[in-house]
């Protein structure tokens, strides 16, 4: 008995009873579900990334095979290059076309009359563009996007091409099995030690972007129609012109080239990407992004109408009310443009959510009962000053209306004392309180408008429809236009993708900036990001304005 070992020998056959055991079957089902969930989260699950030395060895191998006269060798070389440079699988590569006319566009390579090559792909839109977008003040977008093709690929792409619309690979002598076998043979003989696979080739660009943070992956999405997991949401908000998109691609491949050269200084690198302007305007992405001119017109309209409603020295009751409405709309629009706040009822439900000392704002605009997506975002100095002015405005407003609307005056006093009241509450009580006021249409928040009902002014929380109705007649912007503008401008100014996602609340599974194990310093990021957003706001014309009531 002393020699008895309870440890089961792994080589033993599983008891037949285990095969039909319901408990074990449930565990297996859970395991499968977990695998499916991981499979949907491509970037975090598949982390194998080609190193500089592996890429250098592969480039030498491809350059050597390209010199051979065998058609299969040249086809394999072209497939490998396209998988690496387009981020597409073998099946997607062999379905591409080559054409020299712009009629009936499709995915593939376009050869223009000058003999230059362009990679052409349709753009995937969450909401389709409309013909009247420009008249609404929105940035017009295109259905197809053209990206310069590296010149070193053109000789291989032109082999056997005589004009018209043709498949890129007519014979398809290289099947996916042959490609995998050749890559395996190369890897077995490689002195770098890493294994080159078709999966590593086709996913290199997106994994490199995610690992290095050199550019926002949405650039790849729009350029090559990749529809990546990590760009599913952000694709709806980013709007990129050709200069921004091509500059990002150039930075990406310059960074890759430096890593390859650091690993192998003697390797001869081709020009992975070359800047070349497409003859026509190419803006792709969000169909709800206001143009720079539109943003200036909106701000100018808000400012001029605020000036028009300044009360006279007598400060009549009606003039004070109307001025308050204009001041709230100006502040609300600035809040949306500066923070990326979603269009919701009762944004900024409490002034205590503005952490002035740290330059942060707590937002829970698209959340669940557990505040899974609650976030802290940067408050640029210009907005921080405006929120301080707004507090002073509410103090003066309460004094002006205390005789006529005593209940509302007391409510405003309560809103202004929320900081000290919060400190007296237990976290559980504070959470319950916040669930009641968040996006509330009945409990009054700091941003409210007076509406005329039966000859009486009634305060109602500001809503998305109020922002839309207040726009000049020449504009028809969505209520969350500021969110689209903010995302696009941050990418344009080459802000770290991680910071952009943090500000916008675009997180993937496993990312938790507010978790205990997070290494992200919100205060440091906010200090740096605030300077950038401040410049963006001032370029449009936004100012922090003290109230005429103070």
Model-based region annotation:
Residues 223-257, 272-289, 504-549:
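Catalytic-site neighborhood detector that most strongly recognizes the C-terminal catalytic loop/helix
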Residues 253-308, 403:
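Long, charge-rich alpha-helical interaction segments
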Residues 64-68, 170-222, 226-231, 313-323, ...:
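Short, basic (Lys/Arg/His-rich) helix/loop patches that form interaction surfaces
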Residues 31-90, 202, 292-343, 481-483:
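Basic, Lys/Arg- and aromatic-enriched nucleic-acid-binding interface segment
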């Amino acid at each position: 008995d002393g020699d008895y070992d309870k440890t089961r020998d792994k080589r033993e056959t599983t008891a037949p009873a285990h095969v039909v055991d319901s408990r074990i079957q449930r565990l297996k089902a859970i395991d499968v579900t977990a695998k499916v969930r991981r499979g949907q989260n491509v970037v975090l699950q598949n982390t194998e990334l080609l190193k500089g030395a592996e890429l250098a060895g592969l480039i030498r191998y491809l350059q050597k095979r390209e010199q051979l006269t065998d058609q299969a060798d040249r086809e394999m070389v072209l497939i490998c290059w396209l998988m690496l440079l387009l981020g597409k699988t073998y099946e997607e590569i062999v379905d591409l076309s080559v054409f020299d006319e712009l009629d009936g566009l499709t995915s593939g390579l376009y050869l223009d009359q000058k003999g230059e090559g362009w990679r052409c792909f349709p753009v995937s839109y969450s909401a389709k563009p409309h013909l009247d977008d420009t008249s609404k003040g929105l940035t017009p977008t295109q259905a197809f996007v053209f990206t310069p093709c590296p010149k070193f690929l053109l000789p291989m792409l032109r082999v056997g091409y005589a004009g018209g619309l043709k498949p890129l690979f007519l014979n398809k002598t290289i099947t996916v099995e042959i490609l995998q076998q050749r890559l395996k043979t190369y890897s077995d003989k490689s002195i770098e030690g890493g294994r080159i696979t078709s999966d590593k080739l086709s996913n290199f660009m997106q994994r490199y972007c995610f690992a290095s943070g050199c550019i926002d992956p949405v650039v790849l999405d729009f350029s090559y129609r990749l529809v990546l997991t990590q760009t599913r949401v952000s694709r709806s908000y980013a709007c990129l012109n050709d200069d921004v998109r091509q500059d990002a691609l150039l930075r990406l491949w310059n960074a890759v080239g430096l890593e390859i050269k650091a690993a192998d200084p003697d390797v001869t690198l081709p020009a992975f990407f070359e800047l070349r302007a497409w003859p026509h305007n190419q803006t792709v992405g969000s169909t709800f992004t206001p143009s720079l001119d539109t943003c200036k017109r909106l701000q100018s309209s808000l400012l001029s109408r605020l000036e028009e409603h300044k009360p006279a020295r007598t400060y009549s009751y009606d003039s004070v009310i109307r001025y308050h409405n204009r001041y709230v709309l100006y502040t609300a629009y600035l809040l949306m443009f500066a923070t990326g706040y979603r269009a919701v009822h009762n944004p900024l439900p409490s002034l205590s959510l503005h952490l002035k000392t740290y330059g942060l704002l707590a937002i829970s605009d698209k959340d669940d009962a557990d505040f899974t997506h609650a976030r802290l975002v940067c408050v640029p100095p210009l907005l921080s000053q405006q929120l301080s002015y707004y507090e002073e405005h509410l103090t003066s407003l309460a004094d002006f209306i205390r005789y006529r609307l005593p209940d509302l005056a007391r409510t405003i006093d309560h809103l202004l004392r929320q900081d000290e009241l919060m400190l007296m509450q237990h976290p559980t009580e504070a959470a319950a309180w916040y669930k009641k006021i968040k996006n509330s249409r009945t409990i009054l928040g700091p941003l409210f408008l007076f509406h005329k009902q039966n000859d009486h002014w009634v305060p109602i929380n500001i809503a998305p429809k109020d922002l839309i109705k207040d726009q000049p007649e020449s504009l028809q912007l969505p209520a969350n236009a500021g969110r689209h503008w903010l995302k696009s401008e941050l990418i344009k100014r080459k802000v770290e993708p991680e910071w952009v996602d943090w500000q916008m609340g675009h997180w993937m599974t496993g990312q938790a900036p507010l978790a205990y194990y997070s290494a992200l310093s919100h205060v440091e990021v906010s200090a740096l990001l605030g300077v950038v957003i401040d410049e963006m706001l001032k370029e449009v014309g936004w100012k922090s304005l003290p109230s005429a009531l103070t």
